[in-house]
Structures are given as structure tokens and as C-alpha cells.
Amino acid sequence: MSRVLSAVAWPYANGPRHIGHVAGFGVPSDVFSRYMRMAGHDVLMVSGSDEHGTPILIAADEAGLSPQELADRNHRIIAEDLASLGLTYDLYTRTTTRNHHAVVQELFLGVYENGYFVEQTTYGAISPSTGRTLPDRYIEGTCPICGYDGARGDQCDNCGNQLDPHDLIDPRSKINGETPEFIETQHFFLDLPALAEALGEWLDGREATGLWRPNVIRFSQNILKEIRPRAMTRDIDWGIAVPLDGWRENPTKRLYVWFDAVIGYLSASIEWARRLDEPDRWRDWWNDPDALSYYFMGKDNITFHSQIWPAELLAYSGKGAKGGTPRQYGELNLPTEVVSSEFLTMEGRKFSSSKRVVIYVRDLLSRYQPDAFRYFVAAAGPENQDSDFTWSEFVRRTNDELVAGWGNLVNRTANLIAKNFGEIPKAGELTAADQALLDSVASAFGVVGDLIGRHRQKQAIGEAMRAVAEVNKYVSDTEPWKIKDDPDRLGTILHVVAQCVADLNLILSPFLPFAANEVDRALGGSGEIAPMPRLEEVDDLDGGAPYPIITGEYSGFPAWERRPIVPGTPVSKPTPIFTKLDPSIVDEELARLES
């Protein structure tokens, strides 16, 4: 057994999240975490709402709310949506908690005392019309390195290099198109060059494992070539105060939102332990060098997870060129793997809330089963390359693969048992074909589990559905509905099929947890083999306002292995597991999108 940290990207709370977001970080992390729990590992899955930064200020102004009011509203919406999708967070929290602020300031002080912050005069971008600071990501222009027209003020997505806004050629505000003014300002810069050698050694070690996706390791190594200090404070009044005399009193100096957001993985772990009244338990995942940690995100956040966050951890632990010693948290573990997904587009277009090219999670789940979307992400999502969500493909996969494949197998198995026996029948003498099928399905535990553990979820769901097809073929070949005068043989066939369905239900449960409980119930079980998260209203541990979290009791996961079915277990006629979709919804959804 290993301790496994599933560190899931923090959704930004300037609005509800769309399906492109959860396809990148949400579903893949939950499939992995569910499997790892079933495989016997001690999993801690954490995340939360990222609530600081200028985009929150802008969205709050547009909504006529304070930044805190906007964050409160959107955090609740996001938490409800993620829970409805069945994501099994041990803790989904937020960055405006007092706990998070304290942990971020502790990390800052550790990095500062070890000498990895340098104070520099730089240029800040100001909107001439509003006088408000423009964040790096709200400025775009031409990249001075590759010439790409559309580079952001913090990095160029075309060549991957880090940038500063005043480096851009012809910079302009993404808010109103005006040319920003640049004024001198003081900031703390993370001394990345002093951490470059340690970062490089860590990345080389990760590459040697052969586990990282090639695009992630290559990108991470390439950005080291142009490494330079990066500002970790901002001229803004919404965020976490800089915990130094002369700085904390300044209402317009705050820590960079990306400095604080990635620390959320640690602060959420600490909050989780505190809520258990075991305040040091988080250390089992962060200080134990044998613990494993997997970070899930979209590819636009690789830089922050394979450079900025590891650099912060190395600096706090005193592992860079300047040395140093850690403060109260001790030496902190570096990521075992950065699991980055590519982008999901929709009907050939980039998701864009402003252009209304968007399907919000809440809207999708109000009309369709969550497992239908989870299945689409696993089978056709952006695991290794960009993929496109189309309504026609969503309908096809739901109807042809879930309804006609897995759902049909479950329904006809339970119907045949209910009609002929009313309970799980005993198995008589097995034929070679019976035993071969049982052995083949049992082997899928090893094949599918290995693929999920190596973040090959598309292959994993493919192998599981191949086994479903194999069992469906066995049923068609043996034609149990035609057996009228040999109850022993009929019972044996249905026992074999029921065992295979029970096995496949466990194998598919990380992908299809809602259906897993229905299938278990159809075979006479309790319908509780796939634990679900819950929303809970809690008090801030340090005296702040109450807020909702996602948490859950996940000790009830079954083992990742065959569980022999029990003859005599009552089986009733089931209801369909999946809802067949009318092809007309394609035009309806496209019309809804255009309107």
C-alpha cells in the first residue's frame, strides 16, 4: 500500500465551470483516485476554488458585487457541480479561508528566509481609463521571441516562453483594447535561476521513470532553457498580503495569484487533517519520501506545476543553489507526476464563455446522466491530444456503447435471472467456453488497473468495453432464452454471465460510479459499491465565515478483484441503467448553443 496524493487543479471562481474544464482535471483525477482506493492505496484527493486575482475583481464589478460576494456565489456553484459529477474529493475547499492565507504566508516566509526571493524594480501595467492594474494575462501582443501575435503578458502559448508584459511588442489590454501604461513598481521575484539546477535534476529523474507523458516532460525541460526570475507579488488590493513589515500594511501589494493557488494543495491537505482533529496527518503525504503525488490539470497550467510549484517547494526546503533550511512544515515532497490533459473543443471551436461557445457543467447535468459525460471524457477526451466534443458523437457513444453495450448486457442478464430463477442461480459443471470467459474477464482487472494507474484511461475504458462485448457475444452464442428443458445448464450460463457482469461493474466503476451502484442493485446488492461525495456547510477553522466543502466517507470502496457472487441472492426485474438519447437532441442542443 502506498499513500497517494491526488492534487487536482483549482477551478477559477470568476464564473461557473464548463465541460472543457472538468474534462481536463475533474473526471481523469476521479477515475484515478477511485481506482487507487480500490487497489488498496491510502488516497488523499484535494482541491478547491481559486478566488484571488484581477479577473475576480473585473467579474465582481460587472456583476455589481464585492470580490468576496462573487467568490462566495461562484464557489458554491462550482462545488455543487463537481459533487454532482461524483468527484470524490476528501476535501474541496477555497483560497479565501484563513487557513489557506496562513499556509501561503508560511511558504512565502520560508522561501524568503532561504534567500530565494529578490526584490526588484520592474514595470507594472496600468489601464489609462480606469487606473486599475492590468494583470499579465489581461495583456496581449506580439511575442518578442517567436513573433506570435496573441502572446499573453505572462507567457507565449505558441513557443512556451515566460514573458513580462512590457516585453510584448504592441501590447494591448484584452479588456478594452487600449495600450497600457507601464509604471515603475517594487516586487518580489522568485529566483528561478538559483533553483534551475535542482529543477533540472528533478525533471531528469522524472523522465527516467518513463511515466510522464512525453509532451509534458519535453515542455517542462524546454522552459528551463530560458529560466529567469519571476515576480510573485502584484499591485492589486484583492489577494493575500505579503507577510513582511512595510509590505503587509500596503493595501495594494498582494501575492501573485499563481504563487498562492498552487500552495492550495498543501493548505487543503492541512485543512483536511485539522478537520479530522489529527492536525499532523497531512505530513504522511507531504513529508514521507515514499508517498506519491499526482497533479491533474490542463496543458495551459503545466508551467505552474512543473516549474513554479516545484521551485517553491525546493526553495522552502532549502534545496536550491543558495541552500537553506525548511521552517515548520519540513522538507516537502516534489510531484511524482504532472498529469496534463490537452484541450477539449466543442463542435470544432474553442470554449469561450464571452462568445457563448460553452456548455456549463450544471446545464449538461440538468439534462443528461453524469456517467454519460464521464464515459465520453474517458473514451474520447483530450488525454494525449486535443479532442472535440460534438453532440452527435455524445449521442452515438451513449446509445451505441453505454445503452446497447453495457446497459443491454446488464438488463438482459438481470431480466433472464429474474424471470427464470428470481435469484442468482448455482453454477453446475463448467464448459471450456464458460471457464475461458470467466478467466478472460478476471484478467481485465490487471489490464485495466495497470492502464488507469499509468494514466492511460482511454485504453483502459477500451479494454473494459472489449470485455463487455465478449460477454455479450457469449450470451448471444449460448442463447439462454431458448433453453427450456435443462435448468442446470441455464443456471450455469446465467451464473457465469452474472459473475462477469459483477466483475465488469467493479472494473467500470471508476468511470461510471452512478451506474455501478445501479448495476449492483440490479444483481441484488446494496447499491453502495461506488461511494459518493457530499456537500457540507462548515465553519472556517480560524473564525472566518462558513462555506461549503466537498468531502466524503470513502472507506467503503470494494477491493479491485473478483468478488464471487452468492447463489440465492434475490434478483428482480431491473429498470434500464442508461437513458437512450433521441437523435433529435443534436439539433436541439446546437440550436440552444446558437441562441
UniProtKB/Swiss-Prot annotation:
DNA repair is among the record's keywords: no
Source organism per UniProt: Nocardioides sp. (strain ATCC BAA-499 / JS614)
Predominant location: cytoplasm
Similarity comment text for this entry: Belongs to the class-I aminoacyl-tRNA synthetase family. MetG type 1 subfamily.
Cofactor, how bound (note): Binds 1 zinc ion per subunit.
First-tier enzyme category under EC: ligase
Enzymatic reactions: tRNA(Met) + L-methionine + ATP = L-methionyl-tRNA(Met) + AMP + diphosphate
Motif ('HIGH' region): 11-21
Protein encoded by which gene: metG
Localization, UniProt: Cytoplasm
Annotated GO CC locations: cytosol
Protein name per Swiss-Prot or TrEMBL: Methionine--tRNA ligase
Cofactors named for this entry: Zn(2+)
Job of this protein: Is required not only for elongation of protein synthesis but also for the initiation of all mRNA translation through initiator tRNA(fMet) aminoacylation.
Signal peptide: none
